[in-house]
């Protein structure tokens, strides 16, 4: 599916671990690395497309990740002329327009599987530092990567500032015990008052 301007709608995925590193994948049979990405099918919801690509490219499902952020705007890059192809029957694709998603891996990294389809996109992956991809991706994607990572950096910073949810220790209730103590004190006071009153009355009688 290509829009009127010649751009193919696409989703991009940044997967981070709890250490703040991001998943960096090697394209099949090439010495080229990038984030997982893929086209949006006609009539397909953007988020649905993202989860489909997540499974097809790295073997993860929705339950394996937590969605931290989705970019609000389309980001575009043009393909180099050598990569622009046209067979005459289809609109010419001059580049990609992308919506990006930031995911946190919840499951064990051993569940990452690059061979879920007959034609895998990648044949290797590793964790890299957060800003590493901006310097290493192919030049025509670099501006998009810079904008994406700048946006996602703020999200991860806010995530790191959130306090961990810690269950408050249960406090044993002592009110009942305190009430009993005060009731005993009242009874003792009334008993002492009666004894004093009786002795006082006897004194008057004498």
Curated annotation (Swiss-Prot):
Report the sequence similarity comment from the record: Belongs to the Nudix hydrolase family. RppH subfamily.
Co-factor requirement: a divalent metal cation
Sum up the protein's function in the record's words: Accelerates the degradation of transcripts by removing pyrophosphate from the 5'-end of triphosphorylated RNA, leading to a more labile monophosphorylated state that can stimulate subsequent ribonuclease cleavage.
Q: What is the uppermost EC class here?
A: hydrolase
Output this protein's name: RNA pyrophosphohydrolase
The UniProt entry, under Pfam families, shows: NUDIX
**What PROSITE patterns does UniProt report for this protein, alphabetically?**
NUDIX (PS51462), NUDIX_BOX (PS00893)
InterPro entries assigned to the protein according to its UniProt record, in alphabetical order: Nudix_hydrolase, NUDIX_hydrolase-like_dom_sf, NUDIX_hydrolase_CS, NUDIX_hydrolase_dom, RppH
Determine if Transmembrane is one of this entry's keywords.
no
What segments bear the compositional bias annotation Basic and acidic residues? 162-191
Q: Where is the Nudix hydrolase domain?
A: 6-150
Specify where the region named Disordered lies, as residue ranges. 162-206
Q: Which GO terms describe its cellular component?
A: cytoplasm
The residue numbers the entry assigns to motif Nudix box are 38-59
The organism's place on the tree of life at top rank: Bacteria
For molecular function, the Gene Ontology terms on record are:
mRNA 5'-diphosphatase activity
Q: What's the source species for this entry?
A: Actinobacillus pleuropneumoniae serotype 7 (strain AP76)
């Amino acid at each position: 599916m290509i829009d009127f301007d010649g751009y193919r709608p696409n989703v991009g995925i940044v997967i981070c671990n709890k250490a703040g590193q991001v998943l960096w994948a090697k394209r099949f049979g090439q010495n080229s690395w990038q984030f997982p990405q893929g086209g949006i099918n006609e009539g397909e919801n953007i988020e649905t497309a993202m989860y489909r690509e997540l499974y097809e490219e790295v073997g993860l499902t929705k339950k394996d990740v937590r969605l931290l952020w989705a970019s609000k705007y389309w980001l575009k890059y043009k393909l180099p002329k050598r990569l622009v192809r046209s067979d005459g029957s289809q609109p010419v694709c001059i580049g990609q327009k992308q919506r990006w998603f930031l995911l946190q891996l919840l499951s064990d990294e051993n569940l990452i599987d690059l061979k879920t389809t007959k034609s895998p996109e990648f044949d290797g992956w590793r964790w890299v530092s957060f800003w590493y991809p901006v310097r290493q991706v192919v030049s025509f994607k670099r501006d998009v990567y810079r904008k994406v990572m700048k946006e996602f950096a703020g999200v991860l910073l806010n995530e790191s500032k959130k306090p961990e949810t810690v269950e408050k220790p249960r406090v044993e209730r002592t009110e009942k015990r305190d009430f009993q103590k005060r009731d005993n004190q009242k009874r003792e006071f009334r008993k002492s008052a009666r004894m004093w009153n009786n002795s006082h009355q006897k004194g008057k009688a004498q």
